[in-house]
Amino acid sequence: MTNIRKSHPLLKIINHSFVDLPTPSSLSSWWNFGSLLGVCLIVQILTGLFLAMHYTSDTTTAFNSVTHVCRDVNYGWLLRYLHANGASMFFICLYMHVGRGLYYGSYTYTETWNIGILLLFTVMATAFMGYVLPWTQMSFWGATVITNLLSAIPYIGTDLVQWIWGGFSVDKATLTRFFAFHFLLPFIIAALAMVHLLFLHETGSNNPTGIPSNSDMIPFHPYYTIKDILGLLIMLTVLSALVLFSPDLLGDPDNYTPANPLNTPPHIKPEWYFLFAYAILRSIPNKLGGVLALVMSILILAVIPALHTSKQQSMTFRPLSQCLFWLLVADLLTLTWIGGQPVEYPYITIGQIASILYFSILLVLMPITSVVENHLLKW
């Protein structure tokens, strides 16, 4: 008799995806982040669902409803901080996952990569809208500044901004629709993640060597399930430590001041995970130019497969490209730091240099270096 997991119509799908899936035997811990992202999404949906039961999307009561959750609801403080810091863990895993894809050449699986970029944009949009919901000073002014960027679009810009706001400023209509979208989008993210996996399982996973591993595959369970559980335990330990010991470490003090349209905070800045893009936006003096640079800082990932000039898929055996990759990581950390600094000398100059370097590495230096490596290896 056939095992039920191989014959049952529903269990068969799960079996082919998570149990009997043939997987390269050489996957390192860099391949853990996909499953960690899945766990992050589940944690965010569950904590978000319970928070939504107590939240009111009205400008007069939103701030007080969040305070009420923290003070009066059983373990409400835990839910709130798990949700806020869970977003930080989500983005840490997300950036590691994208970095892994860049380093090991996983972008050559273009369908999977493009769905991944769409996922990245959707997660960023969801996080931005969630940041607005507590209706604090930074929420309100962050929403005003970022949505206002759309007014840089020629001809339709101003109308588009007012359409998104639902009025002539960020107000009740804006908050209500942001709450609606913030609740809806995670389920769309879950659906997209399934499509992401569907395309991945069409080609099979990449591996650290970048060499086809069809002759050396092992079942996903028990080998990689155990490995993923270890990664999960490490992530949950870090998240628990963050939530229980220092829940406001990654936040901003202005998030404890109710929104006041008449008083602008001294430094308007987004959460830490958007600071690199914010620094690129600020480094260009022109509004439209800044908006284009902001969008391109993420959309540039879509052209990476077309710029792959190396004869090897992975960077494992390419030391020159490795140096450039780690320079890119350092550059992104620099941009993140600059994004949180005031707009004054020398931060403006450092931000402009780092922004130019970011685009130069991805668009110019990496393809050229790959060609040089091909010649050095006489390929």
Curated annotation (Swiss-Prot):
Its main location: mitochondrion. One of its GO terms (cellular component) is respiratory chain complex III. Heme b b562 binds at H83, H182. Keywords: Electron transport, Heme, Iron, Membrane, Metal-binding, Mitochondrion, Mitochondrion inner membrane, Respiratory chain, Transmembrane, Transmembrane helix, Transport, Ubiquinone. It is a multi-pass membrane protein. A ubiquinone binds at H201. The chain crosses the membrane at residues 33-53, 77-98, 113-133, 178-198, 226-246, 288-308, 320-340, 347-367. GO terms for biological process: mitochondrial electron transport, ubiquinol to cytochrome c. Heme b b566 binds at H97, H196. InterPro entries: Cyt_b/b6_C, Cyt_b/b6_C_sf, Cyt_b/b6_N, Cytb/b6-like_sf, Cytochrome_b, Cytochrome_b_C_euk/bac, Cytochrome_b_N_euk/bac, Di-haem_cyt_TM. Its cofactor is heme b. PROSITE patterns: CYTB_CTER (PS51003), CYTB_NTER (PS51002). It is found in: Mitochondrion inner membrane. One of its GO terms (molecular function) is metal ion binding. Binds 2 heme b groups non-covalently. Belongs to the cytochrome b family. The cytochrome bc1 complex contains 11 subunits: 3 respiratory subunits (MT-CYB, CYC1 and UQCRFS1), 2 core proteins (UQCRC1 and UQCRC2) and 6 low-molecular weight proteins (UQCRH/QCR6, UQCRB/QCR7, UQCRQ/QCR8, UQCR10/QCR9, UQCR11/QCR10 and a cleavage product of UQCRFS1). This cytochrome bc1 complex then forms a dimer. Heme 1 (or BL or b562) is low-potential and absorbs at about 562 nm, and heme 2 (or BH or b566) is high-potential and absorbs at about 566 nm. Component of the ubiquinol-cytochrome c reductase complex (complex III or cytochrome b-c1 complex) that is part of the mitochondrial respiratory chain. The b-c1 complex mediates electron transfer from ubiquinol to cytochrome c. Contributes to the generation of a proton gradient across the mitochondrial membrane that is then used for ATP synthesis. This is Cytochrome b. It comes from Lampronycteris brachyotis (Orange-throated big-eared bat). The lineage of its organism: Eukaryota, Metazoa, Chordata, Craniata, Vertebrata. The gene is MT-CYB.
